[in-house]
Swiss-Prot record:
Catalyzes the dehydration of the S-form of NAD(P)HX at the expense of ATP, which is converted to ADP. Together with NAD(P)HX epimerase, which catalyzes the epimerization of the S- and R-forms, the enzyme allows the repair of both epimers of NAD(P)HX, a damaged form of NAD(P)H that is a result of enzymatic or heat-dependent hydration. The lineage of its organism: Eukaryota, Metazoa, Chordata, Craniata, Vertebrata. GO terms for biological process: metabolite repair; nicotinamide nucleotide metabolic process. This is ATP-dependent (S)-NAD(P)H-hydrate dehydratase. It is found in: Mitochondrion. It comes from Pongo abelii. It catalyses: (6S)-NADHX + ATP = ADP + phosphate + NADH + H(+); (6S)-NADPHX + ATP = ADP + phosphate + NADPH + H(+). The gene is NAXD.
């Protein structure tokens, strides 16, 4: 299938760089290491002179009566990666459950209230990034409130990572994040297909995953897109990266929440570090590559210990060791 004149022109101008990273291919190890070094460059050093909150205050928007695990996984992953504070803005019915999971999270039971947008807005000046969608569900009232929170976040230039039912909302209203280059979308295969059809008004080419991710990003105004799968394909509409860091064959529910939570922290660090630390590469792409690599490494390590019984909680327990192995050695 032809990629179309626009894609061809972009390739001809040399603005599209495709790199495939695989630990199984010797020639790719150097590229893999080079990109991981860019991730290392954005990680702020620990210092006794810093104050609480300086290394990241992350907000997770999601959590309803049915889904309480996802926002917990995202928020606790942000802390495990290195954020100092992690907030959860959830429906009132979800709040006691999420609080019971961990005393380390700051939980706001406001998402289903009429004043949800106002209540969340009061906290936005204190937050460095938002993760929108884990455990959100598709209740119309919740989605309307999340739409308002997203608009308020954009107005304040706050980076947003959108996953799960946050992507459902974007598929219904693509204009919500059109052209907002501090947004990162993290769809799985089905979520990506839905988004692609909604934005480009047609099915994606299953034989051209790289081109499909590139085109969706371009159509959204160069919003960064991470298509999760056997290999994670990342694009900001100009560059395409493929992460094949070794994981495992175990696909447990919740590991996407680990990815989105860790990505929220890494996006903040990357934007704070700036392009000079990423050698001119997109800071958001570097952050996304780091989050994908970390999630896969956690999956690999957990699977080595637990095999078929591996769960996301097992993966989160591996964050510290996986982070050290990838980024501190």
């Amino acid at each position: 299938m032809a990629l179309g004149p626009r894609y061809g022109a972009i390739r001809a101008c040399g603005r599209v760089l495709e790199r495939a990273f695989s630990l199984r291919k010797a020639h790719s190890i150097k590229d893999m290491e080079n990109t991981l070094q860019l991730v290392r460059n954005i990680i702020p050093p620990l210092s006794s002179t810093k104050h609480k909150g300086q290394d990241g205050r992350i907000g997770v928007v999601g959590g309803c009566q049915e889904y309480t695990g996802a926002p917990y996984f995202a928020a606790i992953s942000a802390l495990k990666v290195g954020a100092d504070l992690s907030h959860v803005f959830c429906a009132s019915a979800a709040a006691p459950v999420i609080k019971a999971y961990s005393p380390e999270l700051i939980v706001h039971p406001v998402l289903d209230s009429r004043s949800a947008v106002h209540e969340a807005e009061k906290w936005l000046p204190r937050l460095h990034a938002l993760v929108v969608g884990p455990g959100l569900g598709r209740d119309d009232a919740l989605l309307r409130n999340v739409q308002g929170i997203l608009e308020a976040s954009k107005a304040r230039d706050i980076p947003v990572v959108i996953d799960a039912d946050g992507l459902w909302l974007v598929a219904q209203q693509p204009a919500l994040i059109q052209g907002y280059r501090k947004a990162v979308l993290t769809p799985n295969h089905m979520e990506f297909s839905r988004l692609y059809d909604a934005v480009l008004r047609g099915p994606m080419d299953s034989n051209d995953s790289h081109g499909s991710v590139l085109r969706l990003s371009q159509a959204l105004g160069n919003v960064t897109v991470v298509q999760k799968g056997e290999r994670d394909i990342l694009s900001n509409g100009q560059q395409v990266l493929v992460c094949s860091q070794e994981g495992s064959s175990r696909r447990c529910g919740g590991q996407g929440d680990l990815l989105s939570g860790s990505l929220g922290v890494l996006v903040h660090w990357a934007l704070l570090a700036g392009p000079e630390k990423t050698n001119g590469s997109s800071p958001l792409l570097v952050a996304a590559f780091g989050a994908c690599s970390l999630t896969r490494q956690c999956n690999h390590q957990a699977f080595q210990k637990h095999g078929r019984s591996t769960t996301t909680s097992d993966m989160i327990a591996e964050v510290g060791a996986a982070f050290s192995k990838l980024f501190e050695t």
